[in-house]
Amino acid sequence: MKRSSQDSGSRSIPEDRKLYVVDSINDLNKLNLCPAGSQQLFPLEEKLQDISTDSGNGSRSLFLVGLIIVLIISLALVSFVIFLIVQTENKMEDVSRRLAAEGKDIDDLKKINSIIVKRLNQLDSEQS
């Protein structure tokens, strides 16, 4: 009696494994990962290898796209900085021209002031 219980226990484990394998194959067939009618796992392994190599190429292409985007953005920023430098230079030239013109005006005003002061001094000396 003891033997029959041990035998039935040892036989139930392989049967459970067989059921598990059959259920797994059925699940694969439902997911269309395994070709219809075949129960070999080699095509699945080939598909997994194809997926892994495609993901490597995808990451490379994603990296290249990201690199190109970063280069375009940096080129745009450099162009913008150059544009700002040119605009600042133009503004500085305008300011320096205005200062030079105002400096000439100030010199003219000083000359006129000195002429007026001389004339006033002459008038004061004539009156005294």
UniProtKB/Swiss-Prot annotation:
Membrane topology reported for the UniProt record: Single-pass membrane protein
Q: Name one GO cellular component term.
A: membrane
Q: Where are the transmembrane segments?
A: 65-85
Pfam families to which the protein is assigned, alphabetical: DUF4577 (PF15145)
Q: Which domain of life is it from?
A: Eukaryota
> Where does the record place it?
Membrane
PTM-bearing positions, type Phosphoserine: 24
Q: Which residues form a coiled coil?
A: 87-111
Kindly state which keywords UniProt assigns to this record, in alphabetical order: Coiled coil, Membrane, Phosphoprotein, Transmembrane, Transmembrane helix
User: Which InterPro entries does the record associate with it?
Assistant: DUF4577
Q: What is this protein called?
A: Leucine-rich single-pass membrane protein 1
